[in-house]
């Protein structure tokens, strides 16, 4: 195992910068997830760590070595790919053992390592099968087994679950979590799936357009998004973002102005103590933090357009002063399309963002 350091890592293609100065210190045994939409640079960053892409600027450290100029085989890493990359003519045993044979390890050590990894991954009864005789989940286990037997300093995972169906992804997430708990190998994992990121990560890096939006634990990122991008990307449904205005008067008040002519503005109350907002800002509120209430307690009303019942949860989709919002409901709530739903919310659950910079605005202590 080893620490992994990314220091001002950059990537250019034909003069176009696609990765912009990434900095991160990854501790020994830590599981880091890089999450973001397609095209944000996450796989490019992973491939630079692996040595499969040249680094335009900055440094990658594995342990106490700068590895920029080292070949992939010299970096002491093992990579698990999205498409499994198994040899179809080889058995499970031979696929897992192939890299060790190339390195010239003794047969006894190869056998011991493969059997140990097969035991961890419950592949012991499948060692003589060919990949075509395996399910998708079993093939992915073989790919992980091939990485485990190398006993690398760092594991690299490039969207390894994206080819699996939804039910199998849930199972494999649990198995990956348990695998890391047992091995405690430093791991860097790339995904576009926020659920994978939230469930697997010790810490997560949210990328957008080749830039770091936020680094933190899953709970930190969810509870205190650093930007409107993070607020809208992490969470399902995502955080509601509503434009508001600060109005002077008898104590500064916050209003949601109508999105269209004829929409009634909603007055949300006075500005919280210590919060200094620009004249125009964005208010964020997660669906589960909006509380349906009696009309005389409401700070605003949502015009309900659709109710989605999901069994354990229900969501009302509608408009607040003409702006789209989602409200999480009690699954037994008698709310229907066409209702005018009175809502309230705790000030502790409100988030504020600068619409110009898109960054979070914090209240002063």
Curated annotation (Swiss-Prot):
Main location, first listed in the record: membrane
Pfam families named in the record: ABC_tran, TOBE_2
Subcellular location: Cell inner membrane
Superkingdom assignment: Bacteria
Binding site for ATP: 36-43
Keyword NADP (UniProt): no
GO process terms (BP): carbohydrate transport; glycerophosphodiester transmembrane transport
Domain ABC transporter span(s) in chain numbering: 4-234
Reactions catalysed, as given in the entry: sn-glycerol 3-phosphate(out) + ATP + H2O = sn-glycerol 3-phosphate(in) + ADP + phosphate + H(+)
Entry EC no(s): 7.6.2.10
Stated role: Part of the ABC transporter complex UgpBAEC involved in sn-glycerol-3-phosphate (G3P) import. Responsible for energy coupling to the transport system.
Record's subunit section: The complex is composed of two ATP-binding proteins (UgpC), two transmembrane proteins (UgpA and UgpE) and a solute-binding protein (UgpB).
Family (UniProt): Belongs to the ABC transporter superfamily. sn-glycerol-3-phosphate importer (TC 3.A.1.1.3) family.
PANTHER family membership: MALTODEXTRIN IMPORT ATP-BINDING PROTEIN MSMX, SN-GLYCEROL-3-PHOSPHATE IMPORT ATP-BINDING PROTEIN UGPC
Protein name in UniProt: sn-glycerol-3-phosphate import ATP-binding protein UgpC
Annotated source species: Ralstonia nicotianae (strain ATCC BAA-1114 / GMI1000)
């Amino acid at each position: 195992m080893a620490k992994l350091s990314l220091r001002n890592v950059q990537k250019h293609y034909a003069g176009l910068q696609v990765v912009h100065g990434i900095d991160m210190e990854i501790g020994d045994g830590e599981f880091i997830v890089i999450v973001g939409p397609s095209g944000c640079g996450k796989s490019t960053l992973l491939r630079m760590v692996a040595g499969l892409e040249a680094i335009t600027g900055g440094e990658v450290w594995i342990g106490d070595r700068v590895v920029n100029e080292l070949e992939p085989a010299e970096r002491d890493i093992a990579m698990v790919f999205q498409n499994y990359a198994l040899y179809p003519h080889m058995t499970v045993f031979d696929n897992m053992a192939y890299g060790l044979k190339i390195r010239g390890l003794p047969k006894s050590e190869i056998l011991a390592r493969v059997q140990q990894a097969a035991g961890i991954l419950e592949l012991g009864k499948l060692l003589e099968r060919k990949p075509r005789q395996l399910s998708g989940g079993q093939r992915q286990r073989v790919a992980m087994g091939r990485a485990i037997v190398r006993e690398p300093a760092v594991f690299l995972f490039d969207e390894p679950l994206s080819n699996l169906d939804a039910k199998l992804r849930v199972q494999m997430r649990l198995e990956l979590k348990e695998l890391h708990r047992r091995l405690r190998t430093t791991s860097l994992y790339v995904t576009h799936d926020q659920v994978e990121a939230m469930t697997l990560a010790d810490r997560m890096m949210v990328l957008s357009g080749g830039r770091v939006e936020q680094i933190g634990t899953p709970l930190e990122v969810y509870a205190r998004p650093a930007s409107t991008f993070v607020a809208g990307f992490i969470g399902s449904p995502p955080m509601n973002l509503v434009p508001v205005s600060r109005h002077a008067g008898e104590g500064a008040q916050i209003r949601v102005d109508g999105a269209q002519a004829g929409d009634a503005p909603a007055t949300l109350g006075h500005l919280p103590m210590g919060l200094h907002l620009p004249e125009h800002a964005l208010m964020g509120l997660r669906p589960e933090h909006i509380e349906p209430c009696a009309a005389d307690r409401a700070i605003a009303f949502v015009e309900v357009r659709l109710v989605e019942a999901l069994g354990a949860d229900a969501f009302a989709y509608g408009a607040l002063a003409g702006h789209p919002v989602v409200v999480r409901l009690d699954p037994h709530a008698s709310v229907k399309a066409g209702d005018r739903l009175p809502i309230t919310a705790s000030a502790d659950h409100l988030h504020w963002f600068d619409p110009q910079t898109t960054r979070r605005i914090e209240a002063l202590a």
